[in-house]
Amino acid sequence: MQIKDRAVIKIDSVAFGGEGVGRIDNLVTFVPFSAPGDELDIEITQRKKRFLRGRIIRIIKPSPLRVEPLCRYYGNCGGCCYQHIRYDSQLAFKKKQVEDAFRKISKIADPPVADVLASPEIYHYRGKAQYHAEESFRGWKIGFLDVSGGRLVDIEHCDIMEETINCQMRVLRESKKTLYSKNELAIWSDCPAGESGDGKSILRLVKGKSFLVPHDGFFQANLYLTDAMVDTVFRLAALDEINTIVDAY
């Protein structure tokens, strides 16, 4: 198989990072935006000694795990790679990826990996966005890099961001603030439009307690899972109310 050759492939599994995996001429072949059970007509885009990579030309037979992505940029924007797969299957694949890592790296035959905790919301759950920004002859482009990592995809509305982030994006585009002079732009949810700039602390509530987070600091991205994550840590560590823990990053 050479680059630009065509082939038919059956996808068997999902690799870390979301690419589907099958075999062509006994070579492992990675296919972005595919799902286990897919039968695909693909074009070879990369050939290495131990693997191939291809892109989907046509879905001959779709996997029963496939769903229609909500995002209109999906497949072009490099921000997401699982939206075409049912959410329950996404969680199962991610659990298996952790199990495989323990088996291959730590040589643990049967790693005790728990089921992945499902998010109550699978869209509009992220409380922080790290956008790229660049100036063009038509104005400012704000969004994420494409799947190749070489081109900026201008994103008007991101379906995984909490809606107040999308509102801020609209205001910032219209205001043309000097904030865009940077290559990257961080926006947090629940901030007044245009006011989540550098130097401001962000308020976050966890288990009824208030935390002030630096604008350039780290905080758990999923707004709907933070409380459950803290509960899990307390339970597994057998902590009580008199203990102090630190979420260090």
Regions found by a protein language model. Give the residues of each.
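Accessory RNA-recognition modules of RNA-modification enzymes
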Residues: 1-249
